[in-house]
């Protein structure tokens, strides 16, 4: 059997150069892209940035503030000094999927790109996985175990997280690298808890939905199929309009 080598990176879809670089490295590569409802994806993405490092990737813990700050950040203001991927703070760009998918279609051809929806994966993970196996030319009639992984997590004690993140380098050097790694791993697990993500504010939902809803038809045309979040986005704008009329 011929082995399949895979690589998964978070920002390859967002990157303007990744598609051409992958093509250069592996001309016959097959690309798998998973897309999610922008409302859900951006809320989860923001929570992950906040969790990654206290104040480093995203110091604005309120997603509404982070969403509004994007306009200023794109002209060089309110940028966290220690953020690792500046474009990760451009929420509107992150979930504008059409130009991103188009780059891969244009570079590899549509037949070499498999786009799957998170909604389908959540509803039937096994069948979605088999679809991917078929695309890769792998045996797909196999038993699959698809447990839920990577639930939403939060930091129990932010003060502990801050202290660990700001230990002086001179003090760190007193201890072996392996021991430091074990310490961070153990403390990190103790200081982390699984917590359901709170409901997004209805007005914020309306604002985000109003931005992405008009962009959904272009994605549908590109992919040649219906987009599962088209109606939910439209409904999110209408629900808040109804609330406003009642008030």
Question: What residue ranges belong to the model's regions?
Answer:
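Anion-recognition interface
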Residues: 1-247
């Amino acid at each position: 059997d011929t082995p399949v080598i895979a690589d998964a990176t978070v920002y390859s879809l967002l990157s303007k150069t990744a598609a051409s670089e992958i093509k250069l490295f592996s001309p016959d590569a097959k690309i798998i892209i998973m897309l999610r409802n922008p409302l859900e994806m951006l809320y989860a993405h923001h929570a992950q940035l906040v969790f990654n490092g206290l104040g480093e990737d995203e110091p604005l813990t309120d997603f509404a503030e982070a969403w509004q700050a994007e306009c200023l950040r794109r002209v060089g203001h309110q940028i966290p000094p220690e953020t690792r991927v500046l474009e990760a703070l451009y929420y509107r760009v992150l979930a504008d999927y059409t130009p991103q998918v188009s780059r891969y279609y244009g570079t590899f051809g549509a037949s070499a790109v498999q786009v799957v929806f998170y909604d389908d994966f959540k509803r039937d993970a096994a069948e979605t996985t088999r679809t991917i196996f078929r695309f890769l030319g792998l045996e797909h009639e196999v038993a699959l175990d698809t447990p839920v992984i990577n639930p939403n997590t939060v930091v129990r004690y932010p003060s502990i997280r801050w202290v660990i993140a700001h230990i002086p380098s001179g003090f760190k050097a007193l201890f072996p690298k392996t021991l430091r790694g074990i310490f961070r791993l153990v403390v990190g697990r103790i200081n982390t808890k699984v917590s359901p993500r709170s409901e997004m504010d209805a007005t914020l939902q309306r604002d985000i939905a109003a931005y992405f809803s008009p962009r959904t038809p272009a994605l549908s045309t590109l992919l040649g199929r219906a987009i599962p979040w088209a109606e939910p986005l439209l409904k999110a704008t209408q629900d808040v309009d109804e609330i406003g009329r009642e008030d």
